[in-house]
Amino acid sequence: MSELRFTADHEWLRAEADGSVTVGITPYAQESLGDVVFVQLPELQAYAQHAEVSVVESVKAASSINMPLDGEVVEVNAVLDATPERVNEDALGAGWFFRFIPQDAYAIHGLLDQDAYDRLIKANAQA
C-alpha cells in the first residue's frame, strides 16, 4: 500500500499502482462528523481542484468533499450507497469514496504527508 497524503480539509489520498488515486475522509473527519448515515458519491467525470464532488451526512452535520486535485473520477465506492457506515468502521480502507486519474500524476506529492497532517490536527485542537 502506498503512503497516504492528506488535504487541509481532512481527506486522505493514496496513489494506486494503476495511476489512479483513491480518496476518502480521515479518521479525524469521521470522528468529528459522528455516525455517517448517507454519502452522495460523485459523477464519473472531470472536476477541477476544490470543486465539490461529494457530500457526507452524519447524525451531527453534512460536509462537502472537494476534489483534492484536478482530475477525472473513474470509480466510486458504490457499497457506500447501501452501507454508509463503512466510513465509520474503516475510514482509511473500505470506507473510501472515489478514485480519480489526476491531471498531473506528481501533484499528489505536494499535499500533506503524515507528519504535516498530524501537526495540522494538533494545531486545530489547540485553536
Swiss-Prot record:
| Cofactor: how and how many bound | Binds 1 lipoyl cofactor covalently.
Would you kindly state one Gene Ontology biological process term found in this protein's UniProt entry?
glycine decarboxylation via glycine cleavage system
The record's section on InterPro entries has: Biotin_lipoyl, GCV_H, GCV_H/Fam206, GCV_H_sub, Single_hybrid_motif
Family matches, as PROSITE patterns: BIOTINYL_LIPOYL
Write out the similarity annotation. Answer: Belongs to the GcvH family.
Organism of provenance? Pseudomonas syringae pv. tomato (strain ATCC BAA-871 / DC3000)
Q: Which domain of life is it from?
A: Bacteria
Q: What is the lineage of its organism?
A: Bacteria, Pseudomonadati, Pseudomonadota, Gammaproteobacteria, Pseudomonadales
Q: What is this protein called?
A: Glycine cleavage system H protein 1
Q: Does the keyword Hydrolase apply?
A: no
Q: Would the keyword rRNA processing be found if you checked this record's keyword annotation?
A: no
Whom does it interact with, and what assembly results? The glycine cleavage system is composed of four proteins: P, T, L and H.
- List keywords of the entry alphabetically: Lipoyl
Question: What is a single cellular component term in the Gene Ontology annotation?
Answer: glycine cleavage complex
**Residues annotated as domain Lipoyl-binding:** 20-101
